[in-house]
Structure formats: C-alpha cells, structure tokens
C-alpha cells in the first residue's frame, strides 16, 4: 500500500501545461467519436479569411493545424498560465492572443462580424456573442465535452457534473435562439479507460473542477478501492460523451 500511495503522490506533483495530456499517453485510452474535429476545422480554415479560436489553451491544438491557417488568426484564453504559454507559442507567428474570461459568458472584445470562422474545442461559449462576432455567412464549429462526461467516475469520489445542462440538445436550442442555422449536429457516447490508478490521480489534478479539492490524502479510500478493482481484473473504464455542432450565420 505504501508504495502505491507514494507513487500516486508523485503523480499528484507532476506539472500540467497548456491542455496537453501527452503525459498519459498509453495510460488513458479513449474511444474516438465518428467525426474528426481537427479535419473539419482545417477544411473550414482553408476557406476563411479570419478565425478566432476560443479557449485555445496553450495553443497546442491550433499549432497542429498551422498549414491551414487563414490570413488573420486570433485566439482567446482565460487561464493566466495558458495565456502566457499561448503568447510564447503563437504571438511571434502573427497570432493575436487575447485574455478573455469565457467562463463568465460575458461579451468578447471583438467588433460585430469580426470573423468568418469561430472555432471552439472544449471551451465555454455565449451563443449570442458567437453570433454577434460572426460575419454574415460565417461558420461556428465546436466540439464539446458533454456535461455528463465521466459521471460514473465522479460519483465514486462523491462529485457531480458541474454543467449537466451542457448537452447537444440544449446547445442547439441556444444557438438557434441566437439566430444561427444548424448545419450539422452529432452526439456520441463511448468509453475511456485508465491502465493504472496513478493516471486517474494525474487526470483529476489536471482538471480540478471535476472533483473539487481532490488530493491523494483526501480521497485515499476511493483510490484504494480503484486499485483493488484493477487487481480483481475489473478494469478502470468509464463513460465518455462528446458532441459536435457546425452552425452558420445567415447571409445578409
């Protein structure tokens, strides 16, 4: 037991940078949805003259699509360490990095019709603001983690999803109410698994809102039960949910 606890505490101390889970490669295994958000985003960027990537993290995902960037690229991010990282990675490439508190769903610091493409991968958004900042005929593409993601995992730690209303159906209603036409809307559920308990520790520390105040010390009993489950050959497999929406602002 002592060896496991020390190993888990070591995972707890590992740094997490940007929105990069490569540290868990081979230890967190996730089913893939039937669509490819990067491929769709790249196609839309090649047709655009301007794009804003909402909630870019450290810019790691956007950099992977650099060959498809339009002439004007703007990103927003609200977590200060990620803002700094995004500026270090993107500003010298001509990308405008803006610190915007998307979690508050307030106004974005952009003019009406500023962009003909708005991208959003796993970040909050205000439907009215998306519609306002889109040019006529512009496209909004978003992939979201369903608010009920991993609720079976969270329940083990006595936690509940904080945004259970973040669903495809609700998002479609909000976007349509803002005046956007839904081009595509896809829902998906699958499974994701961890190969060891330490990977769960790292994951929950990296995303602190999943289990508030999580630590090895405060949740040791749950971690020990997960270790016992693994040793019984039951696996550490949980429910994954995502959805994708492409919406368009009407032409003038």
PLM regions and their residue ranges:
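Short, glycine-/aromatic-enriched active-site segment of Class I SAM-dependent methyltransferases
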Residues: 144-163
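Conserved Class I S-adenosyl-L-methionine
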Residues: 181-252
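N-terminal, positively charged/glycine-rich alpha-helical extensions of SAM-dependent methyltransferases
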Residues: 1-22, 31
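Class I SAM-dependent methyltransferase SAM/SAH-binding core
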Residues: 50-107
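A short acidic, Gly/Pro-enriched loop at the edge of an enzyme's catalytic core
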Residues: 105-117
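Conserved alpha-helix/loop element of class I SAM-dependent methyltransferases that forms part
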Residues: 21, 28-50, 60-64
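A short glycine-rich, Lys/Arg-flanked "PGG" loop and its adjoining helix->strand segment in the class I
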Residues: 125-141
């Amino acid at each position: 037991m002592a060896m496991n606890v020390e190993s888990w505490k070591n995972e707890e101390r590992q740094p997490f940078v940007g929105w990069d889970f490569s540290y868990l490669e081979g230890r967190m295994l996730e089913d893939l949805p039937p669509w490819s958000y990067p491929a769709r985003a790249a196609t839309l960027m090649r047709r655009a003259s301007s794009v804003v990537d909402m909630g870019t993290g450290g810019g790691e995902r956007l950099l992977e699509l650099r060959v498809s960037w339009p002439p004007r690229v703007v990103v927003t991010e609200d977590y200060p360490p990620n803002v700094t990282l995004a500026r270090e990675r993107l500003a010298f490439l001509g990308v405008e990095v803006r610190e915007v508190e998307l979690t508050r769903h307030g106004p974005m610091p952009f003019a009406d019709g500023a962009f003909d493409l708005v991208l959003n991968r796993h970040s909050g958004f205000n439907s009215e603001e998306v519609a306002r900042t889109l040019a006529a005929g512009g496209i909004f593409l978003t992939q979201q983690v369903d608010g009920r993601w991993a609720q079976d995992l969270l329940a083990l730690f006595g936690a509940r999803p904080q945004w259970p209303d973040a669903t495809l159906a609700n998002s479609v209603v909000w976007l349509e109410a803002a005046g956007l036409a839904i081009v595509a809307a896809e829902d998906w559920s699958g499974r994701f698994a961890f190969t060891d308990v330490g990977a769960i520790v790292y994951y929950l520390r990296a995303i602190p809102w999943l289990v508030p105040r999580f630590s090895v010390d405060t949740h040791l009993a749950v971690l020990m039960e997960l270790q016992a489950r693994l040793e019984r050959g039951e696996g550490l497999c949980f429910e994954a949910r995502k959805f994708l929406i492409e919406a368009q602002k009407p032409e003038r």
